[in-house]
């Protein structure tokens, strides 16, 4: 597919998706596309997204409001490797260039859903889940997760890896090590956001 096959409006939608991912690190929802481009209803955005998917410009993943994937990102990851995220500065997207220590070649087809980045683990709070200090956590970028999944959460100015337990607007972030406390989060009050779900781990001994 080349951009020449897109209508001007489809190109505008594709550019908006790319720009949103560059700014925030994740794709927009249908409602966000509507607001950005002045569509009157999410149905209009959905029609353009389905047209872009038919032409191969994007992939639509069912079951999530941000289920828009750019094949060009996957191709870049396959050739360059996945970005390895180290320390994350407050207030900036997790995949901001300043956070990326290096790229590491991974066969992304070994993981499901497809991973988007690697997070360097710090500490032993997830020891009993087999996630150790210095390991690389293989992460699928998403803003939706199920109870029991291991998640990457941004909480205030810190990024943490924990097992998720959610009851409405209240979260419990559970460590897999009895030496670490459970973190209680109230989404109506606390500055918290989901940065992805764990889909695998690369042991520290196998790095470099």
Swiss-Prot record:
Bridged cysteine pairs (disulfide): none
Residue positions of the active site: 125 (for autocatalytic cleavage activity), 162 (for autocatalytic cleavage activity)
Entries under Pfam families matching the protein: LexA_DNA_bind, Peptidase_S24
Cleavage, annotated site positions: 90-91
DNA-binding region(s), chain positions: 30-50
Reaction(s) this enzyme catalyzes, per UniProt: Hydrolysis of Ala-|-Gly bond in repressor LexA
Keyword annotations from UniProtKB, A to Z: Autocatalytic cleavage, DNA damage, DNA repair, DNA replication, DNA-binding, Hydrolase, Repressor, SOS response, Transcription, Transcription regulation
Keyword Cytoplasm: no
One BP term from GO: SOS response
GO molecular function: DNA binding; serine-type endopeptidase activity
Assigned EC number: 3.4.21.88
Entry annotated with the keyword Glycoprotein: no
Function: Represses a number of genes involved in the response to DNA damage (SOS response), including recA and lexA. In the presence of single-stranded DNA, RecA interacts with LexA causing an autocatalytic cleavage which disrupts the DNA-binding part of LexA, leading to derepression of the SOS regulon and eventually DNA repair.
PANTHER family according to UniProt: LEXA REPRESSOR (PTHR33516), LEXA REPRESSOR-RELATED (PTHR33516:SF2)
NCBIfam families: lexA
Assembly mode: Homodimer.
Family indicated by similarity: Belongs to the peptidase S24 family.
Protein name, per record: LexA repressor
Native source species: Alkalilimnicola ehrlichii (strain ATCC BAA-1101 / DSM 17681 / MLHE-1)
């Amino acid at each position: 597919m080349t951009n020449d096959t897109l209508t001007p409006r489809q190109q505008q939608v594709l550019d908006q998706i790319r720009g949103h991912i560059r700014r925030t690190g994740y794709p927009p929802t249908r409602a966000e596309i509507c607001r950005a481009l002045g569509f009157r209803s999410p149905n209009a955005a959905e029609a353009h997204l389905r047209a872009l998917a038919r032409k191969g410009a994007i992939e639509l993943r069912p079951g999530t409001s941000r289920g828009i994937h750019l094949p060009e990102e996957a191709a870049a990851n396959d050739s360059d490797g996945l970005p390895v995220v180290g320390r994350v500065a407050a207030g900036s997207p997790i995949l901001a260039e300043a956070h990326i220590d290096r790229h590491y070649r991974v066969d992304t087809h070994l993981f499901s859903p497809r991973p988007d980045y690697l997070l360097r683990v710090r500490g032993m709070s997830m020891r009993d889940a087999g996630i150790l200090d210095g390991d690389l956590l293989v992460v699928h970028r998403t803003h939706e997760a199920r109870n029991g999944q291991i998640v990457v959460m941004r909480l205030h100015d810190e990024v943490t890896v924990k097992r998720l337990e959610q009851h409405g607007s209240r979260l419990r972030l559970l460590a897999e090590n009895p030496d670490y406390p459970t973190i209680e989060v109230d989404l109506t009050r606390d500055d918290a956001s989901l940065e992805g779900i764990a889909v695998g781990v690369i042991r520290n001994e196998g790095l470099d």
